[in-house]
Amino acid sequence: MAKLTKRAQMLREKVDTSKVYNLEDAVALLSEVSTVKFKESVEVSINLGVDPRKSDQVVRGATVMPNGTGKDARVAVFAQGAAADAAKEAGADVVGMEDLAEEVKKGNLDFDVVVAAPDAMRVVGQLGQILGPRGLMPNPKVGTVTPDVATAVKNAKAGQVRFRTDKNGIIHAAIGKVDFDASAIKGNLDALVGDLKRLKPSTSKGVYFKKITLSTTMGPGLTVDHSAYV
């Protein structure tokens, strides 16, 4: 049998994968077992009682994390005229139209979120094969195609997280950093759960929140008591 590394041995001793943790204990344990040299993100996986094979049960949207995510998002905006001015004033990192599209085509994608005014979609639509696979394509369902580009920029800068059920009906989202305290993580999780409740498909039957797991970028997954959300 291969010898366990010190980290693997430590995780085996401290983490009980069969246990359901309360949120405070889970956050404390994730911080305790984080041994990497960077501040790991705290990520949540929420198993929903939906059938993602049915188009009317795909859950997607965006949540502004009230306590931020610990990451300063870079925002690119496709807009012109007054909308472009509003985007710049709101703090957008890059604003443009055809010129910005040319940069994207060259592979210059130094941003985390893309916002577009409706009249800019004629330009953005040509970039689907580049932006789509990277999860950057603007979409009105998550508020990134909007005439109010300033608010979209402010939301992205404030820590807005976009989500969509994967093929197994699971939502994945970053809800903070490992140095966040439990109350900050809980506040962000509460906001996300609130939006998921609001977006529950009418055709979804039975238990909606089936399981919630917290993990860090490089750490173990801990099952969290989610009875308060049922």
Curated annotation (Swiss-Prot):
Protein family per UniProt: Belongs to the universal ribosomal protein uL1 family.
Organism from which the protein derives: Chromohalobacter salexigens (strain ATCC BAA-138 / DSM 3043 / CIP 106854 / NCIMB 13768 / 1H11)
GO MF term (any one): rRNA binding
Record flagged with keyword Repressor: yes
GO cellular component, one term: cytosolic large ribosomal subunit
Alphabetized PROSITE patterns for the sequence: RIBOSOMAL_L1
Single Gene Ontology BP annotation: regulation of translation
InterPro entries hit by this protein: Ribosom_uL1_bac-type, Ribosomal_uL1, Ribosomal_uL1-like, Ribosomal_uL1/biogenesis, Ribosomal_uL1_3-a/b-sand, Ribosomal_uL1_CS
Keywords, sorted A to Z: Repressor, Ribonucleoprotein, Ribosomal protein, RNA-binding, rRNA-binding, Translation regulation, tRNA-binding
The protein's name in its UniProt record: Large ribosomal subunit protein uL1
Role this protein plays: Binds directly to 23S rRNA. The L1 stalk is quite mobile in the ribosome, and is involved in E site tRNA release. Protein L1 is also a translational repressor protein, it controls the translation of the L11 operon by binding to its mRNA.
Highest taxon above the source species: Bacteria
Organism ancestry: Bacteria, Pseudomonadati, Pseudomonadota, Gammaproteobacteria, Oceanospirillales
Subunit composition and interactions: Part of the 50S ribosomal subunit.
Claim: Ribosomal protein is one of the keywords in the record: yes
